[in-house]
Curated annotation (Swiss-Prot):
Family statement drawn from the similarity comment of this UniProt entry: Belongs to the class VI-like SAM-binding methyltransferase superfamily. CHO2 family.
Record topological domains on the Lumenal side: 1-85, 131-195, 245-273, 322-384, 434-462, 513-568
Entry GO terms, CC: cortical endoplasmic reticulum; endoplasmic reticulum membrane; perinuclear endoplasmic reticulum
Keywords attached to this entry: Endoplasmic reticulum, Lipid biosynthesis, Lipid metabolism, Membrane, Methyltransferase, Phospholipid biosynthesis, Phospholipid metabolism, S-adenosyl-L-methionine, Transferase, Transmembrane, Transmembrane helix
Membrane topology summary: Multi-pass membrane protein
Name recorded for this polypeptide: Phosphatidylethanolamine N-methyltransferase
Record GO terms (molecular function): phosphatidylethanolamine N-methyltransferase activity
Ranges where the record places region Disordered: 1-32
Cytoplasmic topological intervals: 107-109, 217-223, 295-300, 406-412, 484-491, 590-963
Lineage: Eukaryota, Fungi, Dikarya, Ascomycota, Pezizomycotina
Name of the gene this protein is made from: CHO2
């Protein structure tokens, strides 16, 4: 027996101790469990924070799993491989085998063709797929229609083997956070699309490199240092290209690399740093520097030219495919402002431009802004003196250049002529702008003679535009005179100089275009020198990367021309032009910008910030010391110029004082004579169409008094007439067994000769009778379908439906139209509606009791507003986000994005009021009230030339002739 058993008290003590030990241990375990639980929750929260969430168009939110780039997936042995990887690698291997075994004479043209095939597959093939996905979600629609991702367990998938293959392929690549069955169909479609992209991109790059290898050679007579420099520059460009691609992929990940935003959006802020601060669209611009590096290493003009073609095709892909989608997705139109608190202070600045005498005497504070721009061929107007002067002087210069001989005298004369225009353009106009900035000299000159600020602004724009055009025209003429066709022994270098020179010229043209798109007409002509600008500085387009793009890129064309001509005189001209441009920026533009915008000016642009962050500390310190020396030098020059400013101002003041639809029909008519085999059993008498719309003209207005008495009698049959742009409802009737692919199209009555077969395409003006049968967004017009009709005959069961034609499905012109019911996706006509008319009623001021041409003031404007508002609402599709509900509300942002709305409005105004406006007028005015003011103002100006009784007569019959 133990001692504890013999001693009861000891036994109780031991028992208590044993009981207390488990209690303490349990408490400790609870604390540990709590800590572990907290750690797990923290880890889960951190994991959730690291995860990316996607959102489909229908609002489904899902976790976007981590994926890897195509090179890693294909070539990294640590990554799992699947059947599609094997297929891609096999096709790549075929390229290498062809490059190795084919005869030498066949390799070059064959690989050029292979590369162009893959490049077309990239830019045209992928571009087409992305376009239809962006506009219609067509890739996702195809996946739904083919039931690619429908679980076979439901019994609805006709191809279970394909489902299992896709499941295995995709889940092998994404082992975490991804289940094939649970992922949204948009994400699965994107993953499938990625595999096609991987094949095309890899083959595109491999075929290009093999073509370069096939074409590579050492030029005859090339020295060691030239060859060494060629390889160093080429390797540097390829390395730079590789860094651009890797850094771009680091920023945008696979989501943007594979155009994921065409399928779904990610719920996080998009940040663009690194290479995206260096250049616009770096993957398509500087991201192709490696092409030119490989061309240098290959020393082949064939590789260079095919690189230029491929690069140009990539820019076309960017403009046609990506930019429209980016605008639609990330830069949608701003919500329409439904009230205007600002009365139009900016309008008052230019109201004086409309200084036509008014008989009404009304106040024109809300007069609209002018929209007659100068820049661009589309704005060329031979009724404007500036444009006429530019064209005539340029033509004179071209004729003189062509007819004069290329002697040294004329060459020197043309160079001096170009230099004089360059000095006037930079120095002369710079002095005028400086005096305008400091003293408003240019404006004061016109005010002195009773002119307005608007007149001064117009005259300045004309002077600047004429000087700009003739400065460049005279430089081109000088280059023409100095150009000599390269000799036979210099063809190699001459070709390179021409290619690089043309590239520099294209760079300057692109820079000027980007500057104009960013600044607009106001900024291009230095409008803030003339008006008190209330605009905020926005660094968009090229200004996102550079503060002054003119400093380097703005004169690139001068150096390009110098390379092409290879003339010392043109090199000196380019140097002088570059120096004058830098001086203009430093002494004219920069001081004014600092005075007007002050601290709102940023110090460093995107490129500068990136370079400063990339420099090591010693280089940064050296750069700061150099900046200090340059600042001190600049201050010295500023003091020197300030001392001579009064003399320059006096001299320049003396100089200043003393000196416009494609065919509606398809080009080839298509007559379908073969009737569908399944047409048997369908009787056209069982089909019917009826219309409902907004009527516009009564039958009593059809009789004008010019007809015979019999023709004035009202007929039983009344032709329907609907408002221009108003939606039209179509009710159809068909047999219950009608084809689900039937469709109804809208046509002009005169477009089709046959009543049995439609001969012309519908051009998008059609709606199917049943949803889900076609791949585009035509289903949007369907309202009701396949509703049983009360049986009126015992032989056929009928159904009916209703659809609406609006927006782009309408004809935006006047005329007589009809609807046609077509069978089974073909063009065989089963029924034709009664013809109806689309008409724009003319504004009849005589019957309205106002005479807007005679200055009836606000009464006339209100009458015009009342007549114009419903028409404009129709033109803007009656969309509450675009169309105004009253005369003061501004038009929606879509009007500025899509020119079709403005063209509809000006067409309606031309037929309502007889006034022909440019579409830009609609954008400038922005609401019905200003448009009404402009219409009244135009009618007032044209009143003496009107043929109507109220607006005037062509012959002054009220006054007697002198005897």
């Amino acid at each position: 027996m133990s001692s504890s058993a013999a001693d009861p008290s000891a036994a109780r003590l031991n028992s208590d101790v044993r009981q207390r030990h488990p209690t303490a241990s349990a408490a400790s375990e609870d604390v540990e469990d709590a800590l572990l639980q907290q750690q797990k929750e923290a880890d889960a929260a951190a994991s959730r924070a690291k995860k990316t969430y996607g959102k489909t168009p229908d609002g489904t939110v899902f976790v976007v799993p981590t994926t890897h780039d195509m090179v890693t997936q294909l070539l990294d042995p640590r990554e799992p491989k699947n059947l599609s990887d094997v297929a891609v690698l096999a096709i790549i291997a075929l390229h290498f085998l062809a490059a190795y075994y084919l005869p030498w004479g066949v390799k070059r043209p064959l690989f050029a063709a292979i590369f162009m095939f893959w490049r077309l597959a990239y830019n045209v093939g992928i571009g087409y797929l992305l376009t239809i996905q962006s506009k219609y979600k067509l890739l996702v629609t195809w996946a739904k229609r083919w039931k690619l991702f429908e679980n076979p367990a439901t019994g609805k998938n006709p191809r279970p083997w394909l489902y299992n293959l896709l499941k295995k392929e995709l889940e092998t690549k994404i082992p975490q956070d991804y289940k094939f069955e649970e992922a949204p169909i948009e994400y699965n479609t994107w993953l499938t699309f990625r595999r096609v992209v991987d094949l095309i991109l890899m083959c595109d790059f491999i075929s290009y490199c093999l073509f370069a290898i096939v074409c590579a050679h050492k030029p005859d007579g090339e020295g060691f240092f030239v060859g060494f420099a060629r390889w160093v520059v080429g390797i540097t460009l390829v390395g730079f290209n590789l860094w651009v691609k890797l850094d771009a992929h680091r920023v945008v990940k696979d989501y943007a690399w594979y155009w994921g935003d065409f399928f779904y959006l990610i719920e996080q802020e998009l940040t663009f740093d690194g290479v995206f601060e260096l250049a616009p669209h770096p993957m398509y611009s500087i991201g192709y520097a490696g092409y030119y590096g490989i061309s240098m290493m290959a020393a082949s003009y064939d590789v260079l030219f095919i690189s230029i073609i491929a690069h140009a095709a990539q820019f076309a892909f960017l403009v046609v495919v990506e930019n429209p989608h980016i605008e639609k997705t990330y830069n949608p139109p701003q919500p329409r402002v439904r009230s205007e608190s600002e009365a139009g202070s900016q309008l008052q600045e230019v109201a004086s431009e409309y200084s036509v005498p008014s008989t009404s005497g009304r106040h024109n504070d809300n007069s609209p802004q002018p929209v007659h721009n100068l820049i661009g061929l589309k704005n060329l107007d031979f009724f404007r003196i500036t444009d006429v002067a530019v064209v005539l002087l340029s033509a004179y210069l071209a004729v003189v250049t062509m007819v004069t001989p290329n002697t040294r005298f004329y060459q020197a004369l043309f160079v001096l002529h170009a230099l004089a225009w360059r000095v006037w353009y930079s120095f002369g106009l710079g002095v005028i702008l400086t005096m305008q900035s400091e003293e408003k000299m240019f404006t004061r000159h016109f005010l002195k003679y009773g002119e307005s600020l608007g007149e001064a602004w117009r005259q300045w724009k004309g002077i600047y535009h004429l000087s700009n055009c003739l400065c460049h025209a005279s430089f081109i003429a000088a280059c023409y005179k100095m150009y000599e066709f390269p000799a036979g022994g210099d063809n190699g270098w001459a070709l390179l100089k021409h290619v690089v020179g043309l590239g520099l010229i294209a760079l300057q043209v692109w820079t000027a275009t980007s500057i104009y798109e960013s600044l607009g007409e106001f900024g291009w002509f230095y409008g803030d020198f003339f008006f008190d600008s209330k605009r905020q500085l926005t660094y968009t387009s090229i200004y996102r990367f550079l503060n002054n793009p003119e400093r380097v890129f703005g004169t690139a064309g001068l150096w390009g021309a110098a390379l092409i001509t290879w003339s010392r005189a043109i090199f000196l001209m380019a140097l002088a032009g570059h120096f004058l441009t830098l001086a203009f920026l430093a002494y004219v533009e920069k001081p004014h910008m600092q005075k007007v915008y002050g601290r709102n000016l940023r110090d460093d642009a995107g490129v500068t910030k990136f370079i400063k962050r990339s420099l090591p500390p010693p280089v940064t310190e050296w750069q700061q010391s150099i900046d200090k020396v340059l600042d001190e030098t600049k201050h010295f020059i500023d003091e020197f110029v300030e001392a001579a400013r009064s003399r320059l101002a006096t001299g320049s003041s003396t100089i200043v004082k003393d000196t416009s639809a494609l065919f509606n029909k398809y080009p080839a008519r298509l007559t379908i004579s073969k009737i569908s085999a399944d047409l048997a059993g369908y009787d056209p008498k069982h089909y019917g169409l009826s219309l409902a719309g907004t009527p516009v003209v009564g039958t009593n207005e059809k009789a004008t008094g010019k007809e015979s008495p019999n023709a004035r009698v009202l007929k039983d049959v009344k032709t329907q007439s609907f408002e221009y742009g108003a939606p039209i409802r179509v009710k159809w009737t068909a047999p219950a067994k009608h084809s689900k692919k039937d469709w109804i199209g809208l046509y002009m009555v005169t477009d089709n000769r046959s009543r049995e077969v439609t001969e012309v395409p519908s051009l998008g003006r059609w709606v199917p009778t049943n949803p889900g049968e076609y791949d585009t967004t035509t289903d949007q017009g369907i309202l009701v379908w396949d509703q049983p009709v009360e049986k009126k005959s015992e032989d056929t069961d009928l159904v009916e439906g209703e659809m609406i034609f609006e927006g782009d499905k309408l004809w935006w012109t006047q005329g007589v139209f009809e609807f046609r019911y077509h069978h089974g996706g073909g063009h065989h006509v089963m029924s034709i509606s009664e013809p109806f008319e689309i008409q724009i009623p003319k504004f009849d001021d005589e019957h309205r009791g106002v005479d807007i041409s005679a200055g009836s003031g606000e009464v006339g404007e209100r009458a015009v507003e009342a007549a114009l508002l419903p028409v404009i609402r129709n033109c803007l599709d009656r969309d509450p986000d675009i169309a105004p509900s009253n005369a003061d509300e501004r038009f929606g942002g879509h009007v500025e994005r899509d020119g079709k709305y403005a063209r509809r409005v000006v067409y309606a105004i031309r037929h309502m009021f007889g006034i022909d406006f440019a579409p830009a007028v609609v954008l400038a005015d922005g609401n019905v009230r200003r448009l009404a003011w402009r219409i009244c103002h135009a009618k007032e100006v044209l009143a003496p030339f009107s043929m109507s009784h109220t607006n005037g007569r062509t012959t002054p019959v009220d006054s007697k002739f002198s005897e």
